[in-house]
Amino acid sequence: MTKHNAKNERIKRKYYIYLKEAKRLSEKSIDNAATAIAAFEQSTNKRDFAGFHIEQAKKFKRELNEVNNPKTGKPLAKATIRTRLNDVKAFFHWLAGQAGYKSKISYSDCEYFNQPANDTRIAMAIREKPVPSIEQIHHVLSSIPSETIIEKRDRALLAFTLLSGMRDDAIASLNIGHVDLDKRRIFQDANTVRTKFRKTHNSTFFPVGDDIEAIVSEWIDTLKTELLYSDGDPLFPKTKIGLDENDQFAATGLTRDHWANAQPIRDIFKNAFEAANLPYYNPHSFRDTLTGLGLRLCRTPEEFKAWSQNSSHEKVMTTFMNYGKVEGHRQAEIMETVGKQGAARPDNEPDAQTIAVVLQHLTKQAKVDEKGTV
């Protein structure tokens, strides 16, 4: 097997610069593209990209469907295959316009990287995600001990994730000063906070209970009064590793550094849920929990629009499509309730709440009309 192809490496380097500077992709997205292209090269034994043939694309698709995920030992998910094929297709589409490749690669040949239609439908299907209930989260929080500084941090981390609805990577990079307890607001400054698409965003605490808010408030007070941290220090600092009394490496406290990524947060969540004898729910699932809560609490389109914006979504449909799926058991409950409501109100008679809202609107409108005729 060929170990290196200098020509391929040069053009790949040029492509990655294009992705970063022209397409403005993140390092993570570029790494994913590089992984997919490397897999294609392995399939062709690192042959020159200029010698691309549609049979190579067909062979690559077959191999992706035959290979197993190294972590699970199961076949790759259709969604994973779709992403890898699209990454390689995008590369060859770009390559077809580059000097030295134009006459050898046609744009139409790139279409051979398309996934079969049935597989694409499987990859794009919306599946019911495991979502924790508010009660389950409360149970986990009550199960976490809060004796050591690390335990207090971990407990506050779960509480803050529910209170803020923020993504885990953004939380990992948040400073103490970004949280205003008096105004119940969070300033997600994209200059320092790793927000999605690096958007600066102001948000307000979600109405999840005074007890949740108290845990976060006590944690910030601990950071400032006991550890003497300032506003520029991390809200959730890294664990400090040192030697314990047995000269073994162990957690000995906290540093003044941020976590480099969100993996430590996910590990904390995993350990907390397992300790509470509950299945693991990742940090992002809390956003689904909050959306479900919003669907129950919000009574007007304007209220849910505000709820959606507080989740850093510019469009309400993003919240509905990605987070607003009604779980199966809840769907059954709603349908049963709707049926009973219909039976209780013959001849389409409106319920008392609807009547009250209509009367309030008519009264307000009458006052406006009255002023206009004076």
Locate predicted features.
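Conserved tyrosine-mediated DNA breakage-rejoining catalytic core shared by Y-recombinases
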Residues: 173-217, 221-227, 231-233
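N-terminal core-binding DNA-recognition domain of tyrosine recombinases/integrases
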Residues: 13-28, 34-126, 143-146
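C-terminal secondary-structure termini that scaffold catalytic or DNA-interacting sites
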Residues: 2-3, 336-374
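Catalytic-site neighborhood detector that most strongly recognizes the C-terminal catalytic loop/helix
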Residues: 311-337, 343
